[in-house]
């Protein structure tokens, strides 16, 4: 087992958090629930009719002993929850009736509301729905955390090259949410990614590099200007981590290249958090690292929300779900 994921599971066990899984029609969710409960990683809440879910589980040989159930159809607080959702979306024209219909019909919204109310500690979804559906529920119900306007994502990349990053571990961001971030959004993404590095990846000293095809003025362009503006924004935001840019990838992570291209940088040559200028480069970058370097990729991990919600790939395995639940439990302490 990977050392980092093992550490996350052990940390989650000590926290005893409750994580809600709304997509109970997926048998992988049921199998993961059994495994998580048996291993003591977290308490699990499921959305739906308890009898029906347990019957589905029994058909595949799964016990849900110890699971908690929340059924929208019999929820005594559904009206209060609906009123709260209406208030959060009132400026967008949402009525009480519409809010209640959404909570009754979409388990992701219902689960997100339980997270927002603090009745559970976090949500994991996406095994049977697109990322956009999970994000929509999280943003509409929970919203960005104080001080941020941007909800984005990151990947924790665990490589076999300990000479780079933090003993081979990196955080890549954003590789899953914002197609063409503004300079302000890039600054938000950097703040969230640095937090992800500390709490999830175990990187004690995040060193954040804003990546580009240019290093310190070696070239110009619209995307380069955006990165430079993000750096200036971050300088006045009183952050507690080192950052620099614009840097080419080799200047960011290779000490010899950094010495030649950015000799006065506190980050160049030792970056462990990589901020990509757009979603194209971020998504391509993590997949290149995953496939060609045979790195383990944890994510996409949603960041910037007031309370933790994480998305699953629709191709996820049971073990993937277990790992993301552990991450969500740990991040509920952020």
Report residues per predicted region.
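Anion-binding alpha/beta catalytic cores of soluble intermediary-metabolism enzymes, centered on
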Residues: 1-268, 273-334
């Amino acid at each position: 087992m990977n050392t980092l994921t093992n550490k996350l599971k052990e940390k989650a066990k000590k926290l005893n958090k409750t994580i809600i899984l709304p997509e109970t029609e997926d048998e992988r969710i049921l199998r993961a629930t059994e495994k998580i409960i048996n291993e003591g990683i977290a308490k699990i809440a499921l959305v739906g009719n308890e009898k029906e879910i347990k019957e589905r589980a029994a058909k595949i040989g799964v016990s849900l002993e110890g699971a908690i159930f929340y059924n929208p159809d019999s929820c005594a607080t559904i009206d209060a929850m609906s009123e709260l959702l209406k208030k959060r979306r009132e400026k967008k024209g949402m009525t009480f009736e519409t809010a209640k219909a959404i909570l009754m019909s979409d388990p992701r919204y219902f689960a997100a509301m339980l997270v927002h109310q603090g009745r559970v500690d976090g949500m994991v979804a996406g095994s049977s729905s697109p990322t956009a559906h999970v994000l929509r529920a999280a943003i509409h119900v929970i919203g960005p955390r104080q001080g941020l306007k941007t909800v984005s994502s990151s990947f924790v990349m665990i490589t076999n090259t300990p000479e780079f990053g933090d003993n081979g571990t990196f955080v890549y961001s954003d590789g899953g949410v914002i197609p063409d971030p503004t300079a302000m959004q890039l600054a938000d993404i950097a703040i969230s990614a640095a937090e992800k590095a500390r709490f999830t990846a175990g990187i004690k000293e995040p060193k954040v590099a804003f990546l580009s095809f240019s290093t310190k003025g070696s070239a110009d362009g619209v995307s380069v200007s955006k990165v430079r503006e993000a750096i200036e924004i971050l300088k006045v935001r009183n952050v507690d981590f080192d950052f620099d840019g614009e840097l080419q990838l080799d200047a960011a992570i290779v000490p010899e290249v950094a010495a030649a291209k950015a000799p006065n940088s506190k980050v160049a040559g030792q970056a462990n958090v990589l901020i990509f200028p757009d979603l194209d480069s971020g998504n391509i970058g993590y997949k290149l690292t995953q496939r060609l370097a045979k790195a383990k990729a944890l994510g996409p991990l949603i960041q910037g929300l007031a309370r933790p919600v994480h998305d699953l790939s629709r191709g996820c395995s049971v073990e993937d779900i277990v790992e993301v639940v552990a991450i969500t439990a740990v991040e509920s302490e952020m």
